[in-house]
Regions:
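N-terminal entry/capping and adjacent linker segments that precede and initiate structured domains
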Residues: 1-386
Length: 386
C-alpha cells in the first residue's frame, strides 16, 4: 500500500519554531554559544549556512570572550616507555555520565621523540618533543614552533641552555598566544634570560634584562596578563607581565608564628583568581587556601580546609611506617582547585593512594570521583574548553 501523501504547508501559515531558530542568526548564535564546543564543530556539516556561521570571526569572538570557564577535566599521565603514552581523563562536568575525552594520546603529530605536555593554558596545550608544539585538543589543530635562537654571551663566549618554556594565552583579549623561553647560563651573577615567541609574528625576540631568582619555572601559572613563578626558598616570587615585558617581585604569605618552614602544595589559577596552598609543620590535615590581590599587595585567606574526615574514611593515606612527626606522614596531593560561578560550590580535587576525591569548601563534604591505578604517575593537567 502506497504511503499517504504528506500535506503541503500553506505558504501563508506561521513558520515552525525550528524554522524560526534556523532563520535567525542572532538567536542561533546564542544557542550555539551555550553548547559544548564539540557540538558546534559537528554542526558545521549541517549546511553551508551553518558552516559559514560557526566559522565566522564574529561567532569565534563571542565564543572566546565568554566569562572565564571552569576546567572540563583532568588528564592523568600514564607511565609508559612508549613514544605516545596514554592519558586517563576525569571529567569535572559530568561525573555520572563521563564525557568522551578530547584525546587519549598525543598523536596529533608524528614526532620521533618522547612527546610530553609542558603546560595547559585556557584550552591550549604546550607540548615538547623534538620540537615545541601548541595543540588545541578541542579542534585537533596544532602549530609547530621554530626553535628559539641560541644566545652567545659576550665577552665570555658561553652559550645559554633552554631551561623551561611557559605559555601565555587569553582568548578574551587576543586570538594570539605567546610562549616564553627561560634560558639559563652557568657561572653568571644573573643567570636567567627570556625570549618570547609571538604567534602573531611567528618570531622569537629577546626580552627583559638578565635576572636571578630562586623560583620554579615548571610550569609558570598564567593569570592577570602575567606568568607567575613561585619561590622555592620562601623568598619573594616573581611574575612577568607578558605584553609589557616587565618582571616584578611577588610576596609570599608570612609563615605563622611557631613554624620555621613552608611546604608548597598547590599553585594555580581558577576563574580568574590566583591561588596558593602551603602547609606548615608536620602531620596536618588543616590548612588555608590563599588568593592573591589583583594589584599584588598580598595574599588573603580565601578558604579554610579540614580533611580530617577524609583521613578517617581512607586510612590508606596514612604512612604508618613513618613517625607521626614526619613531614610526609599523610599522603595526599592537591590536583586542582575549581572555583564555581557560585562560590559555595567551589571545591578541591585531591589524590590519595588509589583514589581521586572531591572536597567541598563550604560544608567540608567529600565524595570519591575516580579510582586511579597505582601505575599512573600523578602528572596532572587541567584542561579548559571554551
Amino acid at each position: 500500500m502506497a504511503d499517504a501523501p504528506r500535506p503541503k504547508r500553506n505558504p501563508n501559515s506561521n513558520p515552525s519554531s525550528s524554522e524560526t531558530v534556523g532563520n535567525n542568526d542572532d538567536l542561533l548564535n546564542q544557542i550555539l554559544l551555550y553548547l559544548p564546543i564539540r557540538s558546534p564543530l559537528r554542526f558545521k556539516s549541517v549546511s553551508k549556512h551553518w558552516l559559514s556561521l560557526i566559522t565566522h570571526p564574529h561567532f569565534l569572538h563571542l565564543r572566546t570572550t565568554q566569562p572565564n570557564p571552569r576546567p572540563s577535566g583532568l588528564f592523568f599521565y600514564r607511565y609508559s616507555h612508549q613514544i605516545h603514552p596514554e592519558f586517563d581523563f576525569l571529567s569535572l562536568l559530568h561525573y555520572e555520565s563521563p564525557s568522551k575525552p578530547p584525546f587519549k594520546a598525543l598523536t596529533f603529530v608524528d614526532d620521533p621523540s618522547d612527546l610530553r605536555i609542558l603546560q595547559s593554558c585556557n584550552g591550549l596545550l604546550l607540548c615538547r618533543g623534538l620540537h615545541l608544539y601548541i595543540y588545541n585538543p578541542t579542534t585537533s589543530q596544532f602549530a609547530t614552533l621554530p626553535q628559539p635562537p641560541r644566545r652567545v654571551l659576550a665577552p665570555l663566549r658561553c652559550y645559554t641552555t633552554f631551561y623551561a618554556y611557559n605559555l601565555a594565552f587569553d582568548p578574551s583579549k587576543s586570538p594570539y598566544y605567546k610562549v616564553v623561553s627561560i634560558n639559563f647560563s652557568w657561572g653568571l651573577p644573573d643567570q636567567y634570560e627570556l625570549d618570547i615567541f609571538s604567534s602573531e609574528t611567528g618570531l622569537w625576540s629577546p626580552s627583559a634584562d638578565p635576572f636571578n631568582g630562586d623560583v620554579s619555572f615548571n610550569p609558570g601559572v598564567f593569570w592577570n596578563g602575567a606568568l607567575h613563578w613561585i619561590s622555592t626558598s620562601g623568598g619573594d616570587s616573581l611574575y612577568f607581565n607578558v605584553d609589557e615585558e616587565r618582571l616584578e617581585t611577588m610576596p609570599m604569605p608570612p609563615i605563622p608564628d611557631g613554624w620555621e618552614e613552608r611546604r608548597l602544595r598547590y599553585f594555580g589559577e581558577s576563574r580568574d583568581h590566583l591561588h596558593l596552598i602551603e602547609i606548615y609543620g608536620p602531620r596536618t590535615t588543616q590548612f588555608n587556601v590563599y588568593a592573591m590581590e589583583r594589584d599584588y599587595r598580598g595574599w588573603f585567606v580565601q578558604y579554610r580546609v579540614d580533611i580530617d574526615a577524609i583521613r578517617n574514611a581512607f586510612l590508606e593515606m596514612i604512612r604508618s611506617s613513618l613517625d607521626p612527626s614526619d613531614l610526609h606522614y599523610y599522603q595526599f596531593v592537591i590536583l586542582g582547585l575549581i572555583r564555581e560561578e557560585k562560590d559555595e560550590e567551589s571545591f578541591l580535587v585531591l589524590h590519595i593512594p588509589g583514589k581521586v576525591i572531591r572536597y567541598n569548601f563550604r560544608n567540608k563534604s567529600f565524595r570519591e570521583l575516580f579510582d586511579v591505578p597505582r601505575a599512573l604517575i600523578m602528572s596532572v593537567f587541567l584542561l579548559k574548553v571554551r
